Amino acid sequence: MTSNSKGVEILSIGTELLLGNIVNTNAKWISEQLSQLGLNHFRQSTVGDNCDRIIKVIQEISQRSNLLITTGGLGPTPDDLTTEAIAKSFNVSLFEKEYLWDEIKQKLSNSKLQDNYSSLRKQCFFPKNAQIINNPRGTAPGMIWEPIKGFTILTFPGVPSEMKTMWEETALDFIKNKFSDSYSFFSNTLKFSGIGESTVAEKINDLLNLKNPTVAPYANLGEVKLRITARAKSEVEANNLINPVKEKLKKEFSNFIFGENHDTLPGVLIKELAKRNETIVFAESCTGGLLSSSITSISGSSQVFLGSIVTYSNDLKNSLLNISEEKLKKYGAVSEKVCQAMATNVKEKLEADWAIAISGIAGPNGGCKEKPVGLVHISISGPNNHITNIKKTFNSTRNRIEIQTLSVNVCLNSLRLILLSKRK
C-alpha cells in the first residue's frame, strides 16, 4: 500500500465466534497473508449475526480504511446476513446473478439435497457491479465490491477451506494488483527462558519505540518472545535492518535467549546433548510424565533420551528408585534430599549421562505452610555425580497444569544453562 493509504481491516461475522464456540482461525490466516503482502493491517473486529450491528461496523470501517475483508455470513440461512448488511450500509439494492443459480443447481444435481435447495438461491444476490469470487469448494460465492471511491470490500464464507481456496485462486491477485506495493514484512523472533516479560520490556524500552524495524514482546507460559519486524523490499534489506537490533538484544540478554523462530526448548536441549553424544533420563513425580512428553514430542529425541520413571507414590519411589522409607518419612517426598536421591538413582539405574528428577506440589490441594502449593524441587545429576539442586515456589494462584508446565520449563532450561556453561 502507498504511504498515504489508510490500511486493511478484517471483519469476522458470526455469533458462534462471539460466544467462543469456535476459534477464529480465518482471521489469523488472513493476517498472515496480509503481512506477507506488506499491507498495513490495523484492526480486526468480530460481530454477531445481527444486521444493524453489522451495518454499523461496516460504515465505521468505510470511513477509516481502504480495504475490508469479511468472513462468514454468506450462507443460505436466515442468520447469514453479510451481503444484505453490506448493501444496506451503502443504500443499494441486490440483484440476482442468474448464472450463479445455474451453477449451484449443477453442483448439487447429484446430491441428496437436490429437492431441498431453494434456500441456496439467496446466495446468488449481489450489488449490481460486484465482481464475484467463485467458490470451487462450496455453494456460497464471495464478492469484490467498491461501494465508494477508495474503499473496497472482499467477502468470503466462514468455512476455512473454502475461504483459503477463494483467496488463493481469485482474491490474492486482485489484492496484489490493487493494494500491494513492492514492500513485504519480514520477522525474526528471539525466544527467552528464565526471565519475565516485564523485565525484558524494561531493559529494551528504547527499542520498543523503533519504527522500522519494530520490536514487540509477547509471552507464553514460561517463555518470552521478542519479534523484530522490518518492512523492506527484499529479505536482504530486511536482515540489514533486523540484524543490528538482534545482536544488541543477544548482547543484553545473553544466556536468557535459547533460540530463534521455530526453536523450542526441548529441541535445543536435544541438539546440544546430541552434539556431546550424551544421554538423559528422568524421574518424575508431580509432573506425571509431562517432562518426558516434552522431549519425546521432538523428532530425533531417541538419540539422547533413554527413558523415564514416573514414581507418583512413595511406595514406587522406594521400590523403583530405592529411596529409603526412612528418608521419605524424615524429609518428605517433596524435598531436596529425596529429589536428589531420585536423580542420582535413576541415572545409575538407567545408565545415562544426565538425569533430571522433579517432585513438587502442583495443587490445588496438598499444600501446607512449610510446603505450599507451587513448591517444586528439581535435581540434575551429571557426569562425575555432580548435582545441581533447584527450588522453585510458583504462585499458588496458578492452576495445576500451569505449575506442571512451568516446572518442566525450569528443568529443561536449567540443564541447558549447565551445558552452556560447560562450553566455556
UniProtKB/Swiss-Prot annotation:
InterPro entries for this protein: CinA, CinA-like_C, CinA_C, CinA_KH, Competence-induced_CinA, MoaB/Mog-like_dom_sf, MoaB/Mog_dom
Recorded superkingdom: Bacteria
CDD domains xrefs: cinA (cd00885)
Pfam family, one: MoCF_biosynth
Entry's family note: Belongs to the CinA family.
Name used for this protein in its record: CinA-like protein
Organism placement in taxonomy: Bacteria, Bacillati, Cyanobacteriota, Cyanophyceae, Synechococcales
